[in-house]
Amino acid sequence: MALRFPRFSQGLAQDPTTRRIWFGIATAHDFESHDDITEERLYQNIFASHFGQLAIIFLWTSGNLFHVAWQGNFELWVQDPLHVRPIAHAIWDPHFGQPAVEAFTRGGALGPVNIAYSGVYQWWYTIGLRTNEDLYTGALFLLFLSAISLIAGWLHLQPKWKPSVSWFKNAESRLNHHLSGLFGVSSLAWTGHLVHVAIPASRGEYVRWNNFLDVLPHPQGLGPLFTGQWNLYAQNPDSSSHLFGTAQGAGTAILTLLGGFHPQTQSLWLTDIAHHHLAIAFIFLVAGHMYRTNFGIGHSMKDLLDAHIPPGGRLGRGHEGLYDTINNSLHFQLGLALASLGVITSLVAQHMYSLPAYAFIAQDFTTQAALYTHHQYIAGFIMTGAFAHGAIFFIRDYNPEQNEDNVLARMLEHKEAIISHLSWASLFLGFHTLGLYVHNDVMLAFGTPEKQILIEPIFAQWIQSAHGKTSYGFDVLLSSTSGPAFNAGRSIWLPGWLNAVNENSNSLFLTIGPGDFLVHHAIALGLHTTTLILVKGALDARGSKLMPDKKDFGYSFPCDGPGRGGTCDISAWDAFYLAVFWMLNTIGWVTFYWHWKHITLWQGNVSQFNESSTYLMGWLRDYLWLNSSQLINGYNPFGMNSLSVWAWMFLFGHLVWATGFMFLISWRGYWQELIETLAWAHERTPLANLIRWRDKPVALSIVQARLVGLVHFSVGYIFTYAAFLIASTSGKFG
């Protein structure tokens, strides 16, 4: 009996129903709830699993390099990045007829292939890779790192190599090592790679291990560093006529502050990027020496937090008690990490298109669209996860005595004010934005488009102007041609910035109008409503007026039985579940906005977005319907084309999405009756009844069915939009 799954819970292993399997899977990673778990084993298990995670990441990136080297056209693409379509990998499919073979044979390939929309070609090209051999070398190295990570994970589960709890809770040492080691040293190493390999490659110089020590990255070598003449490293940058990857128009500078974009590649100057990483390295190397460890010097985190007591007394005991609360709660730490990572992932989405770092990626429109959408969706899931673990912290780890009258306790004490203010903001944004959209729709429907309410986003335009955009005529700060900042910017710092801001060929500070104003507020509504649901879930996780003893029921409970009305749907898990729908909704608006604005920008018909985005029918007709036309003709009775796979995925995505509602709308009783009928039929069907099982089939729990429904909804939603996005963009621009 003891060998039955799940091994980590004897109670579940003895469950006579199929609940054993599903609950076993659901709690497999909830180490805290496992039998015989100790705090020490908990930390050690998580630590070891991190190495497994790293191994998977290295294996995955190694696979990307390997397949492109084996089946891609990297060397061909390098010769002409703007016109050769990069190949991700070959397709072998016995279902392909001759028309499909022809449709999918692209990019100079001999047979059917997938085109890469991930940007890896541009990334590898920018960092100095040039041949398939380079890619194979990288793949092998990452495979080696993957194996090392697996060995390290196994090693740290062996008794002699298991770190103690005190090692895991040594916050200062961890901060120092992560700041200096992880960020500082790796940023410095990356600066080194850019200066020694990538920048020479961009100037036609091929640096590898065999000539690494012979090629000086700068004509004067380390001289300027030791003599304090650092400005010499910035002199003679690449000229505006520089052809990337060649010596034509190349300079000798390695660390610059040019600003703006390389005219040919439309990406940031590599010498600016190297300078940026050097600055980051310096800051983090200093930061990683600030906390007190073995030598009795530097800051103590506990002292820092305990000192944060506002003198006016308006925040009670301030940050007292927070050090132990955070340091002893893995859920709190995970919540903070996820919140930070979520914000950074969203910033990556924004900056990858507005300030592209990789050569020629800005001209690969489908890749730009795919990467923006990809990073925004990931950011959404990570951020909702932050609140989920924040709520679990309040249920499992929060100690009221330890946090009496500090900022954490005061958040809980005035949660009604927080939640009601968020609710008011959401209602205000929602009704006003929808009201404006609907008014504009009615005006168009009745043939009086001139009666639309169109609000210019003057504050946002003023901010853009302050940063140097002149087209609005605000004449303020950097857009004021007579101002000292404007004139200094021409020579002293970032001379290319003002040109870049005022050029129409990039995505930096796009011109905005009434359509942008409206969709901005629609997105603000989505963000505030998602936040409202998540914040309410976390702040009410321990209890509410309706259910003061909520924390005793755990993170995810369906209801407290039939005798206590109104306790359904109020667990912290339910808040997370509802928030994910709103998160997906919001990111839908974000990606629709980004994609439509950019399609019109790339096609040169910006007026379509400006005129049609001020009313809902414009979005439905001129964005969704108009851009799905090529997609839904991917295959028809007369034949198929290279969009057919996306057309099929579009259909399949709708199917998966719709399946979600089956789980979300019908509940346990319906499924239990169905299961019992099916089991009855199975037992009476010849041949089928030879197959028997020990577990009595029972329906999923309410919470599990909601999870399954949510997963189908989310996956289907993303599949559908991914197919639409890639097909509509690649169908127009190749």
UniProtKB/Swiss-Prot annotation:
PROSITE patterns given in the database record: PHOTOSYSTEM_I_PSAAB
Binding site for chlorophyll a B3: 662, 670
Family stated for the protein in its record: Belongs to the PsaA/PsaB family.
Positions contributing to phylloquinone binding: 671
GO molecular function, one term: magnesium ion binding
Gene Ontology biological-process annotations: photosynthesis
Cofactor note (record): P700 is a chlorophyll a/chlorophyll a' dimer, A0 is one or more chlorophyll a, A1 is one or both phylloquinones and FX is a shared 4Fe-4S iron-sulfur center.
Enzyme class: oxidoreductase
Purpose of the protein: PsaA and PsaB bind P700, the primary electron donor of photosystem I (PSI), as well as the electron acceptors A0, A1 and FX. PSI is a plastocyanin-ferredoxin oxidoreductase, converting photonic excitation into a charge separation, which transfers an electron from the donor P700 chlorophyll pair to the spectroscopically characterized acceptors A0, A1, FX, FA and FB in turn. Oxidized P700 is reduced on the lumenal side of the thylakoid membrane by plastocyanin.
The protein's name: Photosystem I P700 chlorophyll a apoprotein A2
Gene Ontology cellular component annotations, sorted alphabetically: chloroplast thylakoid membrane; photosystem I
Residues the record lists as binding [4Fe-4S] cluster: 559, 568
